[in-house]
Amino acid sequence: DVYKRQPQAMAAPTPVSAYLHSATMVKAGVFLLARLWPALAGTEQWFWLVGGAGLATLLVGGYAAMFQNDLKGLLAYSTISHLGLITLLLGLNSPLAAVAAVFHIMNHATFKASLFMAVGIVDHESGTRDIRRLSGLRTMMPITATLAMVASAAMAGVPLLNGFLSKEMFFAETVY
């Protein structure tokens, strides 16, 4: 059900969606898991329930994001995927994974708020958020395009940007 409600909630005005959906509202459940982590982590049930739910959310959110034509819908489903990544980290029995989860929460809030604001600028200037109708924005809005590319690169985990370290911590904890 969250897979349907989350993207619909992104239709709010840009500053509202940037604040609510990058920093506060969507992080409430993850915050609860982080608060329960010291008491419940380390059990096999915690690993399978929380880690499994996180992995499923990570994959389903990423898959659904690939089919979005609305920029805010794309950001909504990528948020679902990132929340799955954070939940998966909290499902692991490792102090470094918990640190990586908290670090990624902060990184996610930073780059996702930037992307929401960029989408708001694009929507205001072009009158649409439909990816199929948008082209040539780099020449029409070079500053916005540059900032959106930097925020997107951070979200992708490009080295030297804030998303890289938390995703590197994710890989270090899940691969080894």
Where on the chain are the PLM-derived regions?
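Hydrophobic transmembrane alpha-helices and their helix-loop junctions in integral membrane proteins
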Residues: 1-176
